[in-house]
């Protein structure tokens, strides 16, 4: 067999851009809080679609004409789920709710700016999300029924990311950071108390992070006693756990590349 020499990168390959683009790409994957529904976002040929599988039933597409695509440049996710249905960050800049089972999507917010990370409260009454407009990012709140306008919960930082509810619905954690840092260079983990009556945050405190320390992925334990997060200090990454009752803090795991 005669071999022909060609410059690097110019030989024929069975892996073409068309073949790569035609494949299915999985993005958001999550369960509903009661564990009865598996939800995922996939795209094929650049077209996003939402699928739901309930129990042993076959998966069904529930996109129904929406384009699930958050418009925040650094990401944040397009989907959130409650026991009742799916919250969708749509390319138009609106949040939608699609119930499990019959029913069309319902718009919850006006078409304004771009958003991501729809995060329903444990009781299903509220929805946290990230919002950006004309270079201004913030953490916002909307009622899950869409009957009143969204409100600003936190602002002032250049970027917001990964909001999380305490199981009681009385506290919220999130990460934020400022220019010129990237989130893996330096960011802050914030914790605040949420007052549902006034729809405001109080007792806001920085738990970890700085211009030199990166933090991320805040997660409350199911019983609400602990808050865990990732922290990157110098060459090592850590899983940090805070006891919210006693204030004790410990490093659960100290290793490398946890943030990778």
Please place each PLM-identified region on the residue numbering.
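Residue-level detector of Asp-centered blade-edge/turn motifs that repeat once per structural unit
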Residues: 33-34, 81-83, 122-123, 167-168, ...
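Short loop/turn segments that connect beta-strands within beta-propeller blades
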Residues: 54-57, 99-103, 143-147, 194-197, ...
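A short beta-strand motif characteristic of beta-propeller blades
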Residues: 14-21, 60-70, 104-110, 149-154, ...
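Blade/loop signatures of beta-propeller domains
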Residues: 1-13, 138
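Beta-strand-rich domains and repeat architectures in extracellular enzymes and scaffolds
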Residues: 14-51, 71-78
């Amino acid at each position: 067999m005669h071999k022909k020499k060609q410059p690097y990168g110019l030989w024929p390959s069975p892996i073409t851009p068309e073949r790569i683009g035609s494949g299915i790409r999985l993005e958001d994957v999550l369960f509903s809080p009661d564990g009865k529904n598996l939800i995922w976002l996939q795209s094929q040929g650049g077209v996003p679609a939402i699928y739901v599988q309930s129990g042993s039933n076959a998966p069904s597409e529930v996109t129904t004409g929406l384009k699930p695509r958050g418009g925040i440049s650094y990401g944040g996710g397009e989907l959130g789920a409650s026991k009742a249905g799916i919250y969708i960050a749509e390319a138009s800049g609106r949040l939608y709710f699609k119930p499990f089972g019959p029913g069309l999507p319902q718009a919850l917010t006006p078409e304004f700016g771009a958003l991501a990370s729809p995060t329903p409260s444990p009781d299903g009454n509220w929805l946290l999300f990230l919002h950006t407009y004309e270079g201004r990012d913030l953490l916002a709140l909307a009622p899950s029924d869409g009957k009143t306008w969204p409100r600003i919960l936190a602002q002032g930082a250049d970027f917001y990311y990964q909001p999380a509810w305490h199981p009681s619905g009385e506290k919220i954690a999130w990460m934020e950071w400022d220019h010129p840092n990237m989130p893996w260079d330096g960011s802050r983990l914030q914790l605040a108390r949420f007052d549902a009556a006034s729809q405001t945050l109080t007792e806001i405190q920085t738990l970890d992070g700085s211009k030199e320390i990166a933090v991320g992925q805040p997660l409350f334990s199911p019983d609400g006693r602990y808050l865990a997060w990732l922290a990157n200090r110098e060459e090592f990454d850590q899983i940090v756990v805070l006891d919210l009752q006693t204030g004790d803090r410990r490093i659960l795991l100290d290793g490398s590349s946890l943030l990778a």
